[in-house]
């Protein structure tokens, strides 16, 4: 199965298998259901892991995955009214590709402020924040437009 970028996943892929890779933004537990917010360079998506439909070994490993770790998820796209995008990925298989250091030196979730000197020291993490990344995407498009003019 070929990898899909998150921005390529649409409602048209409902009930279709997809393979996505990205950084873990957040993991929430709600009883026998785990929600993973997965982010790649294009967008983010909610992934759902049900205890009943997943190997116990994989399900028990998910809450231990640290923020900003890189994972690979295979699953089916399902329509969902609760998901921000109107659909989510139901996890069928999960593989941790790279564990992140814990605790992270800076908060990438934008829930708290980090001093500029610390952000510059860990610029590689700071650039993963959607707000900062969008600045560089806009800047790139402007430079590209000017150079093509």
Residue ranges and their predicted role:
Residues 1-149:
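Class II aminoacyl-tRNA synthetase catalytic cores and aaRS-like
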């Amino acid at each position: 199965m070929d990898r899909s970028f998150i921005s390529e996943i649409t409602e048209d892929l409902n009930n279709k298998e997809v393979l996505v890779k990205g950084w873990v933004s957040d993991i929430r537990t709600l009883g026998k259901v785990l929600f993973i917010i997965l982010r790649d360079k294009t967008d983010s998506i909610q992934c759902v892991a049900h205890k009943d439909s997943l190997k116990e070994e994989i399900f028990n490993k998910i809450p231990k995955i640290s923020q900003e770790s890189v994972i690979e998820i295979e699953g089916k796209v399902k329509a969902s009214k609760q998901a921000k995008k109107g659909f989510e990925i139901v996890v069928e298989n999960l593989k941790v590709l790279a564990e992140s250091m814990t605790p992270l030196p800076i908060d990438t979730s934008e829930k708290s402020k980090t001093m500029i000197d610390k952000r510059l020291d860990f610029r590689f993490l700071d650039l993963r924040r959607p707000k900062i990344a969008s600045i560089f995407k806009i800047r790139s498009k402007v430079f590209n437009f000017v150079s093509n003019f």
